Amino acid sequence: MKKTLIAAASTAVLLAGCATTEPAEDKKADKKVLHTMESYDLLSVDPADAITSNIFNQIYEGLYRFDANNELVPAAAKSHSVSEDGKVYTFKLDPNAKWSDGKPVTAENFRYAFERVIKTNSPFAYLLEPVEKTTAVDDETLRIELKRPTPYFLSMTTFGTYMPVREDIVKAEGDQFGTDPKTNVYNGPFTFKKYQAEQGYTLAKNAEYADRKNVKIDEVDVKIIKDPMLAINLFESGELDVAPLNSENVVTYKDQKEYNTFSDSRMFFIRMNEKTDALKDKKTRQAIDAAYDKKAMTETLLGNGSLPADYIVPKELDPKYDSARQIESSYDVAAANKVLAKQNLELTMLIEDDDVSKKIGEYIQGALKKQNVDVKLLSLPKKERLAREGRGDYDLSLASWAPDYQDATTYLNLFTTGNPFNMMGYSNKQYDRLLKQAESELDQDKRLVLLSKAESLLLDDQAISPVYQRKNAFLQNTEVKNLARHNVGTDISYKYVEIERK
């Protein structure tokens, strides 16, 4: 399912170096343009792929979305009702909803999209597991029947897997669907104006978007920048409106009016490939996790308030779940040394080719070296890291995950036997059984206990080594307002942005 994006031949190069004059041109034309960045390129614009999920919230629209205050609000749907038993959701679509080519958005577009996710064996098909049946009652009515009451279901409809696609476009594009942003149609706030692989893209306000009156900007210019210092320099020169900060820069900027922080729910963790002989033994995996100081790492390398993690379900995703579990630090150098010192392990660890990943990789590499473990770091673009993980071609891999919906299972389900994102060869029948029991448990307190037991078992098995829960420190132009950040689903929304250039 993971397809590589291609740039249309007619697409102009977006980045001609750092000496761009775009902001000045924006003012001349009285065009309101947000200038921002991403640290990695798009992988696909096919919602069934859903890996680069940030883009989907900008170009597509699901039944519901999170607004600027992180409240669930109607989107492509104008309203919904739920049956008394909590198992049937009926959505009434916005009659004004259109695709970017002017054709109406219909219930059949959603029904077909859901069916396609399953038929194409999308790695995200498991997100449709609660759904028993989807029916397009008429053009503006979609009925979704669930296997069981699912209290968090509405939040699931904000994610890419639940977004509509047009069957005629999919059939016309065939295997290339999602690889060229310019040949697709979109029902969200923005459409693609330009795309240049590994350099960036420009989004333009969708003239057919039903809620276009509330989209206050004309374009979003997104550059692909992997060097945080370059991003800061571009921010300082007025060529970026938003730039992330690393630990070296937080102290410099923390008292400035452009300085901002946001606590999100993205978890970073190390996958441990149990198919590798060196990592089959649970004690070895536990020793690797115990060998590095997560607290010192987050304070010295990140310095932005990110939390050291000895858990995989992020804090504050569900306060009730937080109350149902206990978290203990796993850091124990002496215990790690007893297991690792005489093994003379040689391991390869995959990291992405951004500055933060490299620093974390080097920190863990250094800590394990002290325990006589030789770790070779392999720095790769995100797409290549994912491909290596998918093939099982690694020992350790620094990965991350943000919640697709507002429930602990958005993390815990990843590690069940057979889940496409369980790329470590991990399988525990008791773990699977606990999650299956939680699936059918209607008493929410009992359900949370089952889930917390599953998390404890996963961590005791050391299928993964949790590293940290991210907090973002970033610079944002004070002329830019309402750049919404989310801790569930996609990270960010451009829809609500307002710009007043001075």
Positions of the model-derived regions?
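Extracytoplasmic/peripheral linker and loop segments enriched in polar/acidic and small residues
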Residues: 376, 381-385, 413-479, 502
